[in-house]
Amino acid sequence: MSKISPINIKELLDAGVHFGHKTSRWNPKMASYIYGERDDVHIIDLRQSAALMSVALNAIYETVKKDGKILFVSTKIQASDIIAEYAEKCGQYYVNNRWLGGMLTNWKTIACSIEKLEKLEKTLESEEARICYTKKEILDMSRKKDKLLLSLAGIRNLNSKPDLLVVIDTNKEHIAINEAVKLNIPVVAVVDTNSNPDNVDYPIPGNDDSIRSIRLYCSLFADAALQGLEESMKVSGVDIGTMQDHTDKALTSSKTVSKLKQSKKLSKTQNIDEETNTEFDQALGGACENNNSDNT
């Protein structure tokens, strides 16, 4: 039986999950998830968001409980570091820089790239590198390694297709979703008012641009996965301390990738800034008055 706790609507409201895009940008397929509009901005029905989030979290919990693998995907700037942080926190996998076509459907090619990455790392760490290669050659190998690491760090230990795909921003990650559909991999996804919920098995209506919203989603996803992992370990009799060892190693990799991204001087987006109320029914009348959401 699932241990997933009920979702707090106030928490969703405080994170700005209810802010959709401007009404001119909406996707009619999202109509049933929209509560109303204010100042030409759609307001998402958080009662549905809370209910559907619970369903999605239960899917994550059950997947990990049965020793399944989860692949978190979001390559947008404001979600990149967050999704890596929480995927690694729960010992799962992620793609947060660029989705390479065929990451799921052409795994052999991706596996070759991972093998190349590991070979470069081994060469650069060896004494042979100092003796057999010039500084220019070493620099060239380092650049190739860094480029591969940005794309593959989160899946380098993924030896088979994932059992569940978790996506933030279905528009940006449509290629990943299409590949998952071809392989019959179920998809959990945050769907904003400009999104297409088709091909999403577990849709979660919500703001997919706000950093605060994204962090809340990822925190909930990771907690559900950790609960599933804990249950799985109890059943199999595995020492739960091994989970921490796995997470520590993953976090080291995450810090390395984060430094690589900082060296590219990627711009950062700002948090959503708006007034929140204690009851969702008040959101339509007041929460949009200070409408500086990330969605436009």
Curated annotation (Swiss-Prot):
InterPro entries: Ribosomal_uS2, Ribosomal_uS2_bac/mit/plastid, Ribosomal_uS2_CS, Ribosomal_uS2_flav_dom_sf. GO terms for biological process: translation. Residues 252-296 are annotated as: Disordered. CDD domains: RPS2. The keyword NAD does not apply. Keywords: Ribonucleoprotein, Ribosomal protein. GO terms for cellular component: cytosolic small ribosomal subunit. Pfam families: Ribosomal_S2. Gene3D superfamilies: Glucose-6-phosphate isomerase like protein, domain 1, Helix hairpin bin. One of its GO terms (molecular function) is structural constituent of ribosome. Belongs to the universal ribosomal protein uS2 family. This is Small ribosomal subunit protein uS2.
